Amino acid sequence: MVILLASGLIIPPLLLASLGKEGYGVWLLVGQVTAYLPILDLGVSSSVGRFVAKYNAKEDYESLSRIISSSLFLFLMSSIGVIIITLILWPNFSKFFHLSREYFNTGRWLIMLIGLGLAVDFPLRIGQGILQGIHRFDLMYLLRATGTFLRLILIIAVFGWFRSRSLIVLGIIATAITILIDVLMCSYVSRKSPFIVKFEYKSVKFSSLREIWSLSLSALLGTLAALLFNQGQIISVGKIIGTETVTIYAIPIMLLTYGSMVTAYITGAFKPMASHMQALNEKKKLQKLNIGGVKISFIISLFIAVIAIAFGHPFFKIWLHASKDLSSADFAMLSNILTIMVVGFAVGVPQNVSTKMLSGIDKQWFVAFVSLAASIVGFCLGILLMLKTNLGLYGMAVGWATVFFVKGVLVFPIKACHHFNISPLHYIKQAYLPPLIAGGILIVIIFLIKKVLDSSSFISLFPSILLCMIVYAISVYFFCLSQEEKMRLWNIVGFSKINAS
């Protein structure tokens, strides 16, 4: 997590300074377009681990062999599909996005490089699925972190020290590291897994393919929703307004994506926990888990929102100061887009807890359909506002925030209250009101800090945010946490004997 966040803070300003606003925009566009290609695995990647865990626990190695061989067969078919689509995109990508003469050929060859790299990588994804199935999450996360670290070091060396401006070199680095890490995962499972991992065509059965698809299609809908939500909007911005604006629109999304990872890390276990409680018919525990999880997530998302609104503009000027392409108007637009997006983010992210819990109690199809519908609504609204009004990028940002509003206000809280038998008034009082009190105190502190400290430099901005964090943490402790939660917190930090009151 730390390496990923560090990478997210270091790489964008470095590449923006090296490649320029247009060059970085081309890189982002290629990334968003090729992000759709993994859809061709039809959700298989997300289901392999579950089946491996199931049949390995039963020591049913015949079924395990069928699942692995059938999954590999599907991955190989997907690779062929990726190659075909890449060959179609290759001559048309630069024309479609009206790339300038400087980036016309580069854009085409970059699409070819990334697309063929994905085709090679598809079958290698089986390694990650098997690692999940044999519960070697530690190794999987270690290898992923290693890949992120290697990518960071190479980009710093090539674009920071050697001042390269080549998008092709950047594509080679990104593709090679991804393939290398997946090769290492496959190498490990082929040598260390408790069963033999190999592809046998005779083990590819239609029944196994159907079994895999039965679990993977709901995950596929969720993937489609996420792609339409982020990549679809960024691609539309590049097509309708221009390549240079992609950078302005994508950077706030990137920052909020890293912010959502913090809550995702905390709530990652809610799905299996809900499944376990549902199996034992522990209704009170399900209520408590949902309310507590939403409250913690809202505490985090509200802090991110208030800090982003208060300090977004000076942060962007300090963070991206090395880029000579960004004007004062660009920095103002970055800050305004972030403000629009973060409002939706603050109210929507807490309900990720409900989506995980509902998925854990066999409501994954409901979650998938709602997520896809919300993404379609937000996408269409953003396009409409961008084309039919003078809002431009702000219109698309409103569409982005609308997705969170639909899921986080109109649908999932109501569904959670109904399914977990929680009174809406009690839900608001327990999950949302305490963080709002802490947030109100934070706003007052920010107002006072801005009266005293200038936030135009890192030396003054960092202490301001640190002070806000300390005050907010104290407010959360006294106004948001129950006595039981306080005791649990002290136990976590190693002071179990201290009275939390």
Could you say what each language-model-derived stretch is?
Residues 168-171, 185-230, 281-284, 288, ...:
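Interhelical loop/hinge segments that connect adjacent transmembrane helices in multipass membrane
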Residues 112, 339, 374-377, 426-483, ...:
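Transmembrane alpha-helical segments of multi-pass transport proteins
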Residues 1-8, 147, 174-193, 205-276, ...:
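Transmembrane helical elements of multi-pass membrane transporters/channels
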Residues 16-18, 22-23, 134, 138, ...:
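Membrane-interface helix-loop junctions in multi-pass transport and translocation proteins
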Residues 14-36, 67, 167-172, 207-216, ...:
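Interfacial/gating helices of multi-pass transporter permease domains
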Residues 42-58, 133, 194-195, 252, ...:
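Helix-loop junctions and terminal segments of transmembrane helices
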Residues 1-54, 79-87, 117, 152, ...:
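Signature of the first transmembrane helix
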Residues 119-146, 189, 342-376, 383, ...:
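Membrane-interface junctions at transmembrane-helix termini in multi-pass inner-membrane proteins
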